[in-house]
Amino acid sequence: MPRKEDSIPATLRAVSVLEALVAAERPAALAELTSMVRLPKPTLYRMLGMLETAGLVIREPGARRYAPGPRLAALGRAVMLNASLRAERGAILARLVGEIGETCNFTMLDGAQVVYVDRVETAWPLRMTLTSGSHVPLHCTASGKLLLALLPKATRERLTAQLPLNRFTESTITDAKRLSGELSRIRSNRYATDNEEFHAGLVCVAVPVAGKKRACAALAVHAPVSRMPLERALSYLPVLRRAAAAMSSTLNG
């Protein structure tokens, strides 16, 4: 009698393994994955080996735990940056810019940096211009601190320990203990600010965009402090959160 797993195409089994690894939100052991995808250990072990060879899965050094690999992360970024999926997100950002009058952007975590996925610029001539696909640091940007703060604890601590905490302005947080306190406040408040920490004279406020299980992206507004002091930027939190809810619906269907 054919085994159940033999009736499922290998490609679909591989997809289910990748989905399980992403859903785990931390490196998973073979036994954990076996119960998640309901495949025999020998079958799953062989499949993980093939996925590891392809760069879609990585194995922790000195451990028997698996995590999503760099190639899988790159595929996810490519999907998000694909023009065919950006029209609705762009429309949400355009409406937000029309309401606030300042540049708004949609960002995601990309390794130890933030990547700008979508962005709509203000009409003001004085502005900071960044193109989609640009990267900025985590520890001194509103989106970066927000995404870092909302990661699972083990992932957040591991990633934070790797950050160089370079100084960009007099306001940049360069002390690990102080950054940890800032991230704790962000988790409680569910928003983050950049008060001239990345660029002198520039402020930013970011709110989370919910994925199926946790925040997977950030929506932010930024402007010169001479035009939008931080207090005024914070007054737009309700507007940003409404837009973030609309953005979430485009990601989760």
Please place each PLM-identified region on the residue numbering.
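A structural signal for short hydrophobic beta-strand segments in well-ordered beta-sheet cores
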Residues: 57-59, 106-107, 209
